Amino acid sequence: EFCLGLGPTLFGITKGETKYSIHLLPFGGACMMEGEDGDSSDDRAFTNKPVWARIAVVAAGPLFNFIMAFVFSVILIACIGYDKPVISGVMDGYPAQEAGMQEGDTIVKMNHKNIHFCREINLYLYFHAGETVDVTYERDGKETQVTLTPVYDEESGGYYVGFYENNARTRANVGDSLKYGVYYTKYWVDLTFESVRMLFTGKVGVQDMSGPVGIVKTIGDTYEESKIDGMFYVFINMLNISILLS
């Protein structure tokens, strides 16, 4: 059986020796082969194939998830551009302003980790909340490094270094689309591994992880947040979720 989606089957047809079906939840999918769930006398069955062939089949799934993520990321960047890590402003009295950072500065590194677009800034600060960070920024072709210690805000319950990112999109040519497609794919991989690391180190608990209900809620929240920018952005953000779930 070859199916698209998860959950109850909405529609299915059998053609030749294969059943094709569409399921309720619009993400994920499966390819279930003869002999995968039990013994089969068919020479073509999965369990009757050599070990190297079975390893290749099992490895092909994760490999093509990465390839799919890269292809979708390139399409995403080509269609809507990328967000340069440029500061749009600083907050009065916060570490960024006190360190001399200004509107228009471009963030290059955070604790020696290269930064390519705004989401990487948010990702780093989220997973290192409250930690002192060495920020390298570029202004007029010159790089400067400053050390920022986040300030805790009781009202919001979060830590802030005190600068805003400029989320304006920059048009991408073919080369930029391919290059930032790699960066974007790496971003999602980093996000996934950091989330797992926080789970194992106790920074988040199992109760913070989403099951099917949480995933559906996330999709709903993403739709509400994105629809103001148009249905194309809704589609793109849903695509991002699909990449992560893969």
Q: Which residues make up each language-model segment?
A:
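Small-residue-rich helix-interface/hinge motifs
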Residues: 1-41, 245-246
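Interdomain regulatory linker/hinge segments that flank or connect interaction modules
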Residues: 33-34, 40-69, 126, 137-142, ...
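Functional transmembrane alpha-helices
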Residues: 45, 49, 152-245
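Short domain-boundary/entry signatures in modular proteins, especially
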Residues: 77-88, 165-175
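Alpha-helical transmembrane signal-anchor/signal-peptide segments
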Residues: 80-97, 102
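Conserved PDZ fold ligand-binding element
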Residues: 96-118, 185
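PDZ-domain C-terminal substructure recognizer with occasional recognition of PDZ-binding tails
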Residues: 102, 108-109, 122-166
